[in-house]
Amino acid sequence: MAARRVRPPGGVVFEDDLFVAYGFPEPNPLPGYVIVASRRHVRGLYDLDAEEAAALAPLVIRIQRAQKSALGADHAYLFVIGDRIPHFHAHVVPRFPDTPPRLRGGRVLQATEADARPVEEVEAACRALEAALRR
C-alpha cells in the first residue's frame, strides 16, 4: 500500500511522513483490522531507523485505543511477521466480545473467505477509526 497506491476496503485511516495505516485487504475477518506500513521501504522491524522505531509504538497504541473506544473492541492484538511481503508492516487487530474462538489471537491470520465481513461494515469501521485518530 505504501508504494503501490492500491485502495483497500476502508482506505487510509492514518498517515504521516513515516507510516500509513489502512484497512486490511479482503477478505477482512474483523472490522477495524488495520495494517500499519512504513513509508520507507525496509524489510523488517529490525530495519526501522531510530525515528521510525520511536514513532511506531505510540502510533500502534493510538490505533488500539481507537479500536476500543470507537469500535467497542475489548482487546487488540499486534502482529509483525514479514514472511510473505518483503516490506515492513504490522497487523493491528481488534478483538470483540463476540469474536469467535477461531479468529482470536494468531488464528485470525488464518481467516478464510468464509470469515470475510461485508465491505460496508469494514468501510464503516475504518471511517470510525479515522475520525477517532483525528481527535
State the predicted function of each range.
Residues M1-R135:
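HIT superfamily nucleotide-processing domains
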